[in-house]
Every structure is written in structure tokens, then in C-alpha cells.
């Protein structure tokens, strides 16, 4: 069933050592570098704000307050959520937009699913574009999408949630060190994967199904961002597979064949562009596996 805790003896609580922390310049630092930077926004009708999170081998983010390094003065409560400095930068762009009637576009330059519910709810933010880590050459593609020279067709490969720290995988995550390990052991840490396969969309979609079916205590308040009964719409900002385009499409499933001898499933789908802009669409097929 969903919810509950388990104690693992001889494992110490994780720390922020070995994890990334986000560091964005404050308004004071930007003013010191260029006192007129806000005024320059009035000269353009499109403001691009980049929210970045670094990535690297053997390093990641620990969601929630535990992942914030207090020595860094980051002005935030979650490394995967917005900092106060990032909010201030977005607010400055929105204010400039009011003066020149332009657009505010937020670029998500990251390798981790960040918490962007407040941006989705912000009427002053006109669009968000997930660009990942494109590198120097990849930014040519970003420019093509922003200018309309290319029509985006990508879809999220992860679930963007309201609070990452509420997921079981985040609760179990950390550089947990054994207190009774042999001193000769080179790697003295343990990652508890009590959540099994239920990470990302596998957790959110399965718990949603259990909520609908009324089983497994799925509606329990454990893991809820609101402190009330767990509700999918309160937890998920953008689901796995979400994506937009400058045009519209319809999809029709014409044929579905299951070959148990070859262990294959073949689908025939007709995709029709019903808009005025050339583009591509993604056909997504989902299967629900039994609990066996």
C-alpha cells in the first residue's frame, strides 16, 4: 500500500555532500554588474529568462530542504524549485512586459525535472520551453524553435511535479553511509530503493489508478503536497509525454495487432495535421501491465 515509513539501521541520514546546489545571481549582484540592466528590457518585446540546473556524473540533486546547502545563501527551500533570486528576475521581466507589451518566455536549461507549477500559474509568463542541456550547437535549434523557423514536436520524458521531495524515490534518495562498514571498503554508501519500479511516471500514474479504484490507501495524505487526500491534479504539473506544437493534429488508431508468438504489438495510426503550420507529431502507445 502507499504511504508509511521504514527504518534502516546502521545507515546515517544523508547530507548535501556530493550533490549539486543551484546558484543564480541576486538582484544586487546584477545591479552591481550593470545598474541599467532592467532598463534594457524595455528595448525589446521578448524577454528570455533561463532557469538552469547543472548536471554531471555521480552527482545529482536531493529534493526538498535537505538538499539546500545553508552555507551557499541560495534563497530557496528546494534545489529543484525556484529561488527567490530567480523569482525576482522573472518578476522584473514581467514588469518590463507590461511597459512594452511583449512576451516573457522561460527556458528550462536542465537535466532534472524542476518544479515549475508557479510559472504555469503565473499569467505574466507566456511560455516555457524545456531545452535540456543542448550545448553550443544545440542552441541553434532552440533559436529556430523560438523564432518559428522550426516547429517543436518534443514531449516530456519525465513527469514534472509540484514537489519532487514528496515522491517515494526522493524520500529514499541520499548518500547514506554505513556506520559499521569495514574501513578497507572504498565505497561506503547505500542507496535504498524501497520504491521498487515506482519512480517518475510509474509512481504517479499507478497511484492515480489506485486512487480511482480505491485501493492500496492511494488517497492517503502521505506524499500529498496539500496535506489533504492525495490527488493527481494537485501533484502533477505536466505529465510524462506532454508537449505542444505550433499546429494541431488528430490521431486515429486504425489497427492494433498482438502477436503472442513473437511477443510483439503492432499499431497502425493515421496522423493528420489539422493546422496551418508544417510539423511533426509523436504517436504514444501505453500499456497497463498486470501486478504479477
Where are these regions (language model features)?
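C-terminal non-catalytic regions of proteins with extracellular/luminal or membrane-system context
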Residues: 1-292
